[in-house]
Amino acid sequence: MGASLGQRGKRLNIQTFFISIGARYKRIRKRPRGVPSPQLYEYKVEKLQELESKASEGRIRLYYADEIHTCTEEYVPYGWQLQGEDVYVPSQRVARLNIFGMIDRDNRYNGFTTFEKMPADKVLSFLDEFSFNLEMDTFVLLDNASVHRNKKIKELRPLWEQRGLFLFFLPPYSPQLNIAETLWRILKGKWIRPQDYITSDILFYTTNRALADIGKGLRINFSKHVA
C-alpha cells in the first residue's frame, strides 16, 4: 500500500510540475511522415505570407480548404468520468459524412457535405459555382491531394482565374499551414459533443448545424490557435 501511495504521489508531482510551467494535458496530434523540400517550403511560406498580408488589408479573400469526415466510430472523444460511472458511446454500423470546407480568418465559411466518397467532380463543381459569386480576387489554399490536382481542375484553372478565383497549393506534408485543420479539430473536439455520437442521424445533423453556424453563433479566434 505504501508503494501504491508513493506512485500516486509521483504522478501528482509530475502533473503539478507540468501545470506550473503552463503545459496542458491534451490529445497528441498526428503529423505526416514526409518532409517537404526546404527550398519549396520556404518559397511557399513566403508567398502565403504575402497573401495573408493582402487579405488582412482587404485587397483579396483568402480561404483555407480541406476535406474531413465525421464517423460514428472513427472519433471517440474524451470525457470526465466519476468513479463507478459507465460512460460510453454505443457501437453501431459505421456511417460516414464527408466534408469539403473552406474558411478564412474572419470565419467566412463555404463548403458541402456528402455521403459519397469525396469525388473530384463534386469539388470541381463546387469551386466552379463558387467562382461566379466573388466580390474580389479570391485565393483558395489547398493541399496536394489527387482530388485537387486532377486533369479537369487543371483545365478549368485559367477560366477560374479570369473570374478572379486562384488556387494556391501548400508544400507537401505541411498541414500546419492550413487553418482548416484548426476548424476540424474544434468541430470534432468541441462543437460535436459525446452524446451527439449516439446515432448517425444525430451526429450528421449536429455536424451540418455546426457548419451552417460558423461565422454566426460559432466563431474561431485563429490568432489563439495553430493548425
Regions found by a protein language model. Name each.
Residues 1-227:
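Short functional hotspots at interaction and active-site rims
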